[in-house]
C-alpha cells in the first residue's frame, strides 16, 4: 500500500432515485466522475442507489433488482475507479445464490481492483422498512480494507446505530468508516420526532469517533 496522505477528500453521493435502475446507475457514475474531477479520493454512494427504496412493501418482483457480485454494476465502478484513480464504496442489492440476498457494499481500490464486500448485519423490520423480507444478515463480520487512501471500514445504514459495529470495525484497523445510508422517518413521525432522532443519530456518530 502506498503512503497514505495526511488529508483525504471524500465524495459522498446523494440523489433522488428514478424508477429506471439503468438511469440511476448512469447518474451515480456521472456524479462519481464529477466528484473525482473535483478532487475526491474516496467516493461513497448512498444505500441501494440503483433503485427507489423498494423495502416499503413486501413484493417478490423486487428481487429482480438484485445482481451477483461481481456483476455489471461492480464492473462499471471498477472501470471508473481505475480511470479516475479513486477508491469507491458502492451499495448494491446482492444476489448471492438462489433465495439468498444481501444488502451489500463493494469496496474498490484506486487501481480498479475489487478488495471485498461488506454485507449489512443489522436488518430492520418496521412499517415501511420491511428489509428482513429481502435481506439475509451479513456473515462476514466487521472488517477493514487497505486502500490507496487509507484503511477503511464500511457499515450500512442501521448498522451505524450499534456501537459495537463501529468498535469492531475500528479494532479491525479502520481509520475511516463509511456508512452508505437510505435513512429516513416514517411520515407520521417526522414532525414530532425528527429533530430528536437526528440529534440522537449525531450523538451515536460522535460516540463512534471517540
Model-assigned labels for residue ranges:
Residues 64-154, 205-210:
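Catalytic-core segment of enzymes that process non-peptidic bonds
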Residues 14-19:
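Short polar catalytic/cofactor-binding loops
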Residues 10, 24, 32-61, 81, ...:
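Active-site beta-strand/loop signature of hydrolases that rely on acidic residues for catalysis
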Residues 56-64, 126-127, 186-193:
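Short glycine/proline- and charge-enriched loop/turn segments
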Residues 22-29, 70-71:
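Glycine-rich anion/phosphate-binding loops
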Amino acid at each position: 500500500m502506498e503512503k497514505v496522505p495526511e488529508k483525504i477528500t471524500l465524495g459522498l453521493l446523494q440523489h433522488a432515485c428514478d424508477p429506471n435502475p439503468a438511469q440511476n446507475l448512469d447518474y451515480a457514475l456521472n456524479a462519481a466522475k464529477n466528484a473525482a474531477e473535483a478532487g475526491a479520493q474516496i467516493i461513497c454512494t448512498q444505500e441501494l442507489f440503483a433503485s427507489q427504496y423498494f423495502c416499503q412493501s413486501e413484493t417478490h418482483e423486487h428481487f429482480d433488482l438484485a445482481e451477483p457480485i461481481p456483476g455489471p454494476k461492480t464492473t462499471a465502478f471498477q472501470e471508473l475507479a481505475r480511470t479516475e484513480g479513486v477508491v469507491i464504496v458502492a451499495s448494491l442489492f446482492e444476489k448471492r445464490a438462489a433465495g439468498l440476498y444481501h444488502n451489500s457494499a463493494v469496496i474498490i481500490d484506486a487501481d480498479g481492483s475489487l478488495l471485498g464486500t461488506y454485507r449489512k448485519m443489522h436488518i430492520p423490520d418496521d412499517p415501511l422498512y420491511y428489509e428482513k423480507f429481502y435481506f439475509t444478515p451479513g456473515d462476514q463480520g466487521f472488517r477493514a480494507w487497505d486502500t490507496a487512501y487509507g484503511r477503511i471500514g464500511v457499515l450500512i445504514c442501521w448498522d451505524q446505530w450499534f456501537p459495537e459495529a463501529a468498535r469492531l470495525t475500528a479494532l479491525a484497523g479502520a481509520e475511516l468508516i463509511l456508512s452508505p445510508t437510505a435513512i429516513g422517518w416514517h411520515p407520521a413521525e417526522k414532525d414530532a420526532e425528527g429533530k430528536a432522532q437526528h440529534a440522537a443519530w449525531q450523538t451515536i456518530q460522535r460516540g463512534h469517533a471517540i
